[in-house]
Curated annotation (Swiss-Prot):
Source organism of this protein record: Salmonella typhimurium (strain LT2 / SGSC1412 / ATCC 700720)
GO cellular component, one term: plasma membrane
Chain ranges of the ABC transporter domain: 2-241
Inducing stimuli: Induced by osmotic stress. Part of the osmU operon, which consists of four genes (osmV, osmW, osmX and osmY).
UniProt-listed SMART domains: AAA, CBS
Function: Part of the OsmU ABC transporter complex, which is involved in the uptake of osmoprotectants such as choline-O-sulfate and glycine betaine. Probably responsible for energy coupling to the transport system.
Main location: membrane
GO biological process: glycine betaine transport
Coiled-coil stretches noted in the UniProt entry, renumbered to this chain: none
Record protein name field: Osmoprotectant import ATP-binding protein OsmV
Inactivation phenotype: Deletion of the osmU operon eliminates the residual osmoprotection by glycine betaine in a mutant that is lacking the ProP and the ProU systems. OsmU deletion has no effect on the utilization of glycine betaine as an osmoprotectant when ProP or ProU are functional.
Record keywords: ATP-binding, CBS domain, Cell inner membrane, Cell membrane, Membrane, Nucleotide-binding, Repeat, Translocase, Transport
Family: Belongs to the ABC transporter superfamily.
Protein's UniProt keywords contain Nucleus: no
């Protein structure tokens, strides 16, 4: 865990005037989570990051890593236990890729075989052929490949904490997305505590478990990506995340988040049509989903067809043209609804059981209601 307590950094300008680059910042990043420090240039993000591994000394306040105050730690030992990734990559041009990756492990006394094995493991994580690249030098690799090496080098000694200062900023958009996706896959497996600096709202929304928005050295809001978009704290945050923030939420909210807010109303194949009609009439719905004994959707019965009809639901059940998964984001769901020219569809869990229904109206209601997918226990500045 990373904990910042009243962290402040004050510089003296050329004319002798004091300037608070970081002003009384309080922030908790739980173990295994990624927090993105987001804001415009000069707002204190990078200064905050550099104080964590003591590249810059704080003017006041405390930094705790897993409960230990960094002021009480040897600076060299501290840095060897923190992975650090910068935009400029910083690979050593006179070292091979293997030597670059294993700089810190070799400092820690790892033997050659262990270093090589670790380098091969990390190369595999970013889809680079170890046999092809480990003996090469940085100049023999593309910019995107070098950036991958910069990321895995920071992970070589398996540090619990990773600091990243705009790590993907110098890469072209196509490579950036690939590297971001690879890094997310690694993070899901490794569960490092990560603090990442960015000025890109889309990158922050994609990568962060939580986002701390900086302005003039202070945190003005710290929230989950979905909450940040749904409930910006003030006009500055709202303008920074963009006027299309509701559309951005489509990528963050899952179908299951929406169906969890809706009543689950179903019938069985053997349910009398008169009973099914009564249920639909009571809840003012135009159709009811029919499920089997395992809870899997078989189709639906229309209210107008069940009115005054005899028999059971199985007699007039219409099969579904499409179904969605609970983990699908709303962008995928909307796309499938539009492609199929239908207004609603059933959502199923990983075992294929009925989870509820989702419609264009439900999605609009959810996004406009201000509800968020989860609440985080976040300590932010007042």
């Amino acid at each position: 865990m990373i904990k910042l307590e009243n962290l402040t950094k004050q510089f003296v300008q050329k004319k002798g005037q004091p300037l608070k680059a970081v002003d009384n910042v309080n922030l908790n990043v739980p173990e295994g989570e990624m927090c993105v420090l987001l804001g415009p240039s000069g707002c204190g993000k990078t200064t905050t990051l550099k104080m964590i591994n003591r590249l810059i000394a704080p003017s006041s306040g405390n930094i705790l890593i897993n409960g230990e105050n960094t002021n009480d730690m040897d600076a060299v030992t501290l840095r060897r236990n923190i992975g650090y990734v910068i935009q400029q990559i910083g690979l050593f041009p006179n070292m091979t890729i293997e030597e670059n990756i294993t700089v810190v492990p070799r400092m820690l006394g790892w033997d050659k075989a262990r270093c090589k094995q670790r380098a091969e493991e990390l190369m595999d994580m970013v889809a680079l052929d170890a046999r092809k690249f480990l003996h090469r030098y940085p100049k023999e690799m593309s910019g995107g490949q070098q950036q991958r090496i910069g990321v895995i080098r920071a992970l070589a000694a398996d540090p619990p904490v990773l600091l990243m200062d705009e790590p993907f900023g110098a890469v072209d958009p196509i490579n950036r997305e690939v590297i971001q996706n690879q890094f997310l896959d690694m993070q899901r497996k490794l569960k490092k505590t990560v603090m990442l600096v960015s000025h890109d709202i889309d990158e922050a929304l994609k990568l962060g478990d939580r986002i701390a928005v900086f302005r003039q050295g202070r945190i003005v809001q710290c929230a989950s990506p979905d909450e940040l978009l749904a409930k910006p704290a003030n006009e500055f945050v709202g303008s920074f995340v963009g006027q299309d923030r509701t559309l951005k939420r489509l990528l963050l909210v899952s179908a299951g988040d929406v169906t969890d807010q809706q009543p689950t109303i179903t019938a069985r194949p053997s349910t009398p049509l008169s009973e099914a009609f009564g249920i639909m009439d009571d809840h003012d719905i135009r159709a009811i989903t029919v499920i089997d004994n395992d809870g899997k959707p078989l189709g639906f019965v229309k209210r107008r067809e069940a009115r005054n009809a005899s028999g059971i639901c199985a007699d007039i059940t219409h099969p579904f043209r499409i179904t969605g998964k609970a983990e699908d984001n709303l962008r995928i769901v909307l796309s499938r609804l539009y492609e199929s020219n239908t207004s609603w569809m059933p959502i199923v869990d990983e075992d294929g059981r009925y989870n509820g229904e989702i419609s264009q109206d439900y999605i609009a209601d959810y996004l406009s209601s201000g509800r968020t997918r989860r609440a985080l226990n976040i300590h932010e500045n007042s």
